[in-house]
Amino acid sequence: MLGRQLYQRLSPPLVLLGITPTGVEIAAHAAQSMTASFDVIVGAHVRVEGHGIIGAIAEDGDAVIDTHFEPTFDLMDALNAAIDKARRAVKSERLLFRGQRQIRSLGERTVVIVDGHLVAPWKMLASASTARELGAGRVAAAAAVSTQAVKEQLSVHKLEFICPSVVLDPEGHAHPFGDPQDPSAERLRSIVVAREAA
C-alpha cells in the first residue's frame, strides 16, 4: 500500500532511504516493487532522563532538537551527553548496516525517507535534514503507520508526508510493524536486508 502511494505521488528517479532499523525492510521492498534505488540512513534518538525523546541525529548531521524542550543550565551537560551517546550509537549502527560504505549519491534526486511506525518525528526530521545536506533535490517522508501528532509536526516542518495509516492514539498502532516480543529479531532481519539490497 505504501509503495503504491509513493508510486502515485512521486516521479522517478527515486532513492528510498530506510531509517534503521524499523524502516529498512519496508523501504527495501517498496524500492524493489518500484524499481527505485535503496539505501539505509542511520539515525538515533536523543533521550534525556526525565524528559524522554527530545530529538535525534542522522548520520553525521547536526542534532535536531524539539523546540519545546528548553533545557535549564544544569541540564546542558545531560543534553550534551545524550547527543554524544546518540552519535556513538549512529557510528556503531552504521558499521552493522552499511559496513565502511558511504550512503549512495543523492545528487538532485527525489529522496524518500521511510520508517515503519512513527510515534516521534525526530529521526525522520534529522534524516530529512541529512538528505538535504547530501544534495537531495526533493525530500519526502513516508511511513507505514504514523500518529496524527507526528503527521502534524512533519507538516509544520514543511516535509511532504506519505502514510496510508494515521492513528489518533499518541502511543501509535496497537500492533506496530516488527516483533515487539523480540526487537532483536527485527533488527537482525533489517541488517540482513540492508546488506543484501545495497
Segments from the language model and where they lie:
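PRPP-associated nucleotide enzymes
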Residues: 1-198
